[in-house]
């Protein structure tokens, strides 16, 4: 099983965490919107 990696908008962190995703980076800007990398191991 391969881990799934996403670039999520920061305000959706709790939403993705509810599915088991874990924060895997510091915040970064993409198109002036705050994002974080998340991984589902």
Task: Name these PLM-found stretches.
Residues 1-3:
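Short, high-confidence coil segments that cap the C-terminus of an alpha-helix
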Residues 6-13, 27-41:
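C-terminal "cap" of GNAT-fold acetyltransferases
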Residues 16, 21:
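Conserved active-site tyrosine of GNAT-family acetyltransferases
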